[in-house]
């Protein structure tokens, strides 16, 4: 594993990756795999 990791540098074509959204009232469990599976080519296509 790397000592540091910056997703903004890894995926610069995904402008919303730096946003942190408060979804505390949603009450839905979402795994990291769920989030990554929605990412299309270089994170620009989103979920369908």
From Swiss-Prot:
Q: Where in the cell is it found?
A: Lysosome
Determine if Hydrolase is one of this entry's keywords: yes
Q: Name the Gene3D superfamilies on file.
A: 1.20.5.170
Reaction catalysed?
Answer: Hydrolysis of proteins with broad specificity for peptide bonds. Preferentially cleaves -Arg-Arg-|-Xaa bonds in small molecule substrates (thus differing from cathepsin L). In addition to being an endopeptidase, shows peptidyl-dipeptidase activity, liberating C-terminal dipeptides
Classify the source by domain of life.
Eukaryota
Q: Name one GO cellular component term.
A: lysosome
- GO annotations under biological process? proteolysis
Alphabetized UniProt keyword annotations: Disulfide bond, Hydrolase, Lysosome, Protease, Thiol protease
Kindly state the subunit structure of this protein: Dimer of a heavy chain and a light chain cross-linked by a disulfide bond.
Q: What does this protein do?
A: Thiol protease which is believed to participate in intracellular degradation and turnover of proteins. Has also been implicated in tumor invasion and metastasis.
Protein name as it appears in the record = Cathepsin B
Recall the taxonomic lineage recorded for the source organism: Eukaryota, Metazoa, Chordata, Craniata, Vertebrata
Q: Source gene?
A: CTSB
């Amino acid at each position: 594993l790397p000592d540091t990791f910056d997703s903004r540098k890894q995926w610069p074509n995904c402008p919303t990756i730096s946003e942190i959204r408060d979804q505390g009232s949603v009450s839905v469990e979402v795994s990291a795999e769920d989030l990554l599976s929605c990412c299309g080519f270089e994170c620009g296509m989103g979920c369908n």
